[in-house]
Amino acid sequence: GTLPACINGDNEIVYLLRLGGIKIATIYENGNVELKAKIPAIVKTLMSQTKNYNLPIEETIMKSYILKKNKFKTDLHTHMNANLSADVLIALGLKRQIKYPLYYLKKLNLKMSKKQEKEIAKQRAIVAEQFKNSGLEGKKLTRKIDDNTFINFADFIFNNLENAKYNISKIRISLSILKDGQAVFTNLEKLYIYRYVFCKGIECDTKIKINPNKIQKIPEPDIKKLYIQMMKDLENPALKNITLRQDKILWIAREYKKQNIYYTEISDTDLAKANGPAIKLVEELHYILPYIEKETGVKIRFLVALRRIPLTIIQDQIISGNYLRSNLDVLKTVAKSPYVVGSDFIGEEINDVTDLKPAIKELVDYVYEVDPDFTIKIHAGENDSLRDNVSKSIKCIEESLNQGQPMPKVRLGHGLYTEDLSSPEGKKLLRKLKKDNIILEFQISSNVRLNNLSNLNLHPVKKYLDAGIKCVQGTDGCGFYGIDTIDEQLALQNLLHLNNKDFEKMRKVEDEVVDISNKYFEKKSKDFKKFLNGRNITEALAELEKENHIKGKQNKAEMRINTNLETQEVLSQKVKQLPTDKVPIIIAGGSFNKKGRYTEVTPEGKELLKQLLSKVDANKAYFVIGHKMQGYEKEIVELNKDMNKHFEINAIVPKMISQTDSDNILQENIDGVSISIESDEMGIYKSFNYEIFERRNSVVMAFDGNSPVSNLIQEAKNGKGKAKIYVNEDSPSLFDKAISLNGYAIPFKTNQNIIDKIIEDNPEIM
């Protein structure tokens, strides 16, 4: 269409772009565009998730400003390696001339120059020789060699400018969470691998000289601007010799300053690493943070991040042994620093928080005996299968209190799912939250982006605020989710309908946290100086860590409760690979529930399974179920036997399994089991992804379940293989998921004949 020309107060010709009555932008004659509204990242996710987007325009396009008095000043929920944007990480990689592995060059299909291809081929041959007798073979050997073959990242970009635009675009995409639809924790774990190349980068031994003319040819203006500033920093004596990590923290502060954020608490697992890494980080913090505060005005504090479960990508490194024991010993060491203000249990919420009660007890004791102002934070209420984790978190802390000990400073991250807040249990929870002065942290974008929330009407923040509960906003990592703090606050305002009074309440909590933190820092700084007593930081903390490890070894108790059995031992006779010559049909309904919830099989649902068994060819398809032998999954096994069918039925089971589930699998007519890399049962959806959705076409029939089956469905939608997904909308817990995937998943009711539709859509199983 045509935009009418207007004259503004300065007698300039301008063009006003409006859509749906909302002013989008002012366009000036010289081509400058002044944006007045935006589509937040969270809305873009919801739009890409469905083929039938139906949010109204006022909840899609939002004014891009907030009243100054209501603008949040803190980010109290974020993670160290999730904070920086892709552009900052790429610029840091160029400045630092990091090693960029061949594995990622291949994985992202990046383009090298002919000279670079020849050089890296020579290097790879040398590396291959080193692993000749490693015992590895096939894909594992290839991966090992490619992981240890590198190109200088600066060389890759500056001496390959003809491909720079293409390569930077691909690398950018790899450094933030999936944008075209909701992601799941599998995507998060993969993303961390790509970000670690930059966040934990290793500088090349031999650096190249950068021609100034080539700097001007960086095809992305934002990256060029960042890189030029980073090179100017080298002229500053205070910044000339800082480490990559210190550089990273400096840029975190600079990015926060742009957003008017002046206080943040960052969770970092490096602060829990024994024998040097944690102490090294503290030493670096004590050098760089005073400078950062002086330059930016941003105060950065840290929380020791303790993994509730290890990340899948690094599980083999730390799963063995009582890893939380070592983490807690290190925590008690680094917590001497005034920059370390608390702890944070992080990671995917797929286990009952009471599993962590021994570790929580030890933290509560530490607060009582050593540091009464130390914060205990727990990620809880992110998973609808564990709705009691918020109340259980509080209970674990209360039951750990020593006689006469007041409730510590407690914050709960997410708080999205709890008991119904209008029920007696929910009202009891609200009273406890208020009485114990507990702060809830909300991150709406990460909730939606990580498939924990599909229906925005279910978000409880407004109810908490109305009940007088202290609430704050966090980001969960701006760079990770491609957002900023303003984007988050706009989403709260326009999608969750928080008003100015709500924001005033949240700002008041922020002010309280910052005020307490400032006093805490002042006191703790004096205590730290006394503790050092003339020693340097490394010397003093190394001595203390050694003492803490000795004391820790005297405590033989496991810090995480686990009564399950090793699946490989109890089901060894059942372990086998999934077939590759047939189409897998996944039946979900029984293994994917919250604890204590049982799936009831309806007569209509049973009839659908009978029809499916009758019409599908056993030579062309097989069934895959979960580990519980309950509900529709158990029903397909029994019907296969009763109807004298000969379908192969396999189960994907967790790495650790209960005695009951193990016995049930052995008693049923299960042809084989595939053992997941995940120890917790709610994480087995990841193995459905690795074993099926990323490798082959499949059919998914989701009858019932909570968050785990929602993740299973999302994995099927996101996978490289083509999955036909059928979702039972009679199940209340699946209804919202079916709606959000409108056009990508086919909803069905158990009293309808969906089987003919399945056969029609999937002729290869006939």
Q: Residue ranges of each PLM-predicted region?
A:
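Acidic/glycine-enriched connector segments
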Residues: 550-750, 756
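A charged, well-structured terminal subsegment
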Residues: 751-765
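Metal-cofactor-binding active-site regions of metalloenzymes
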Residues: 18-20, 31-34, 38-555
